[in-house]
């Protein structure tokens, strides 16, 4: 099965999205999610043109890994932090097909 990547855009006010991401890192919740079976990437970014948004790139080996993550103890903690910081989200979901023809354009 192909890798699944979910981009989550957390939007807040007065620095709340960044404070959320910092608490996720400092509390160890982000590391616990990274340690879950099937997690391939869990990384926060701040768009240069929008300091009130934080982008989470969250990649998983397959849908079963995402389903297991959704019932993990970390999801309850994560949901509580989202509420604490009053965040709103936009989500994009991608399934990688590893298109071979693109590799000639990629410098690794």
Task: Give residue ranges: language-model regions.
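Short, flexible helix/strand-to-coil boundary loops that buttress conserved ligand/catalytic motifs
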Residues: 24, 69-70, 79-82
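Short N-terminal helix-initiation segments at or just after the protein's N-terminus
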Residues: 1-5, 35-38, 56, 88-92
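Short, well-ordered beta-strand segments in beta-rich or mixed alpha/beta enzyme
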Residues: 4-11, 41-71
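Glycine-rich beta-strand-turn "strand-cap" elements at beta-sheet edges
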Residues: 44-52, 77-108
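Alpha-helical elements of the RecA-like P-loop NTPase motor core of helicases
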Residues: 18, 64-67, 76
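N-terminal/domain-start segments enriched in small and hydrophobic, helix-friendly residues
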Residues: 3, 9, 13, 25-26, ...
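Short amphipathic alpha-helical segments
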Residues: 16-40, 74
